[in-house]
């Protein structure tokens, strides 16, 4: 989405300074029609971590050049062992860290914020409806607060078009297999941390 491209350009421009902290929050109140995600054995996966957790973690990771060193998480589990709310801390080393909160119990939200010594950038709605303009809030020590409007766009159409170009024009995909590997590795480590109630090294 052009909204996220603008955020990444803001971070890379260094007007915020080196990013030392990021936070993401993704949630929606789960409806009975979706209880299959949490109302069964978790042997084959399920719960909020594997549902909306990938978005929260991937969003955070884009702020840092490094892969994380360790994670710590806590969760609220139901009678099937499915996490319906999970919060955690990701340590990227060198005093760089991120927190996340994902839930099937909270009101709908898809928020993200990154902080540097010189400023911060906030995305109030990551999953912006295709028919609505997106908004980005930038607040720097030198220029103060500004709000930018990004043209409306359809996430899914953009994704499909990019996928088609990767195949037809042999271009490099925006997301690599290594990126996917690390996202899955972090999610698995978060799951392990919940189970063991401890820090887990990656």
Task: Describe the role of every protein-language-model region.
Residues 13, 93, 148, 164-202:
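C-terminal helix-rich "cap/oligomerization" subdomain common to oxidoreductases
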Residues 1, 108, 157, 174, ...:
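Loop/helix-junction capping segments adjacent to catalytic residues or to phosphate/diphosphate-binding pockets
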Residues 4, 56-57, 131-133, 157-161, ...:
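A general structural signal for well-ordered alpha-helical segments in protein cores
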Residues 44-50, 145-154:
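A short glycine-threonine-serine/GTX helix/turn-capping micro-motif
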Residues 57-130, 150, 160-170:
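Contiguous beta-strand/loop segments that form the cofactor/metal-binding neighborhood of enzyme cores
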Residues 1-72, 79, 197:
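Predominantly a Rossmann-like dinucleotide-binding segment in NAD(P)-dependent oxidoreductases
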Residues 90-94, 137-144:
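Short acidic, glycine-rich loop/turn motifs
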Residues 112, 130-141:
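Short polybasic amphipathic segments
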């Amino acid at each position: 989405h052009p909204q996220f491209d603008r955020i990444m350009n803001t971070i890379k421009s260094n007007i915020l300074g080196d990013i030392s902290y990021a936070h993401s929050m993704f949630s929606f109140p789960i409806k009975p029609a979706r209880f299959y995600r949490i109302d069964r054995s978790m042997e084959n996966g399920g719960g909020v971590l594997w549902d909306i957790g990938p978005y929260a973690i991937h969003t955070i990771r884009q702020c840092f050049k490094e892969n994380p060193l360790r994670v710590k998480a806590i969760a609220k589990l139901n009678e099937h062992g499915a996490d319906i709310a999970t919060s955690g801390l990701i340590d990227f080393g060198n005093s760089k860290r991120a927190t996340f909160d994902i839930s099937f119990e909270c009101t709908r939200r898809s928020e993200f914020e990154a902080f540097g010594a010189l400023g911060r950038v906030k995305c109030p709605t990551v999953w912006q409806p295709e028919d609505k303009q997106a908004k980005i809030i930038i607040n720097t020590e030198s220029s103060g607060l500004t709000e930018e409007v990004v043209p409306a766009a359809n996430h899914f159409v953009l994704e499909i078009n990019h996928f088609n170009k990767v195949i037809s024009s042999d271009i490099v995909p925006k997301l690599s297999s290594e990126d996917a590997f690390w996202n899955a590795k972090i999610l698995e480590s978060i799951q392990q941390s919940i189970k063991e109630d401890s820090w887990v090294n990656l």
